[in-house]
C-alpha cells in the first residue's frame, strides 16, 4: 500500500505480520480501510465506528458497552483509535470481553505525531503506559513494539507536508531510516533511537 507517511508504512508492516482465523472486529475502521487486506488468515472483518460517514458496518461508541456477547471475536483491531478515546479504559475492557479465549488484540497508536482530529485527539501513550493499560484490562502475553526508526523518522514526519509524491517518499524514507540505523549501529541505545523517539507503537 502506497503512502507518504513513515508511520503508516510502519503500521502496515506490523499489520501484515498478523494471521487471524475467525471473525475480526475493527474499532474505528471503515469498509474502505486498506489495511484489512494485509491481515492473513481466514476471517471476516466487521467495522464499528461512531461516525456513519466513514462507511462502517455498525455505529456505536467504543467508550460505552459494546453490543456483542462475550467471546464473539477472534480478533479486535484498534488502528489509530485509542488516542481519540477519552474513556479508553472502557474500550479496552470491552475488547477483552468480546475476544474469544486466545484471541488477538492488535492496535497502533501514534506517539511523536501531530495533534489530529477524527473527532478529537486526547492522548499520547508510552510503551510503559500501554503495557499497564492492557494488563489492567485483563490482557496477558502483552507485546509492545516501537514504530519508526528514531529521530530522523520523526524529522521526516515533520517535513511530510512538503513530500507531495509517493516516489519522493520512496526515496526519502529509506534515507532517513538509514541515518537512524547508522547512528544506532555506531552508538546502540542512543537517545535518538526508536526506543526513545518512536513515531508510535
What feature does the model see in each segment?
Residues 86-90, 94, 104-201:
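S-adenosyl-L-methionine-dependent methyltransferase catalytic module, highlighting the catalytic core
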Residues 1-18:
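Class I SAM-dependent methyltransferase Rossmann-like catalytic core
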Residues 5, 18, 76-77, 140-142:
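Residue-level marker of intrinsically disordered, low-complexity segments enriched
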Residues 2, 6, 56, 79-82, ...:
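Short N-terminal micro-motifs specific to bacterial/archaeal maturation
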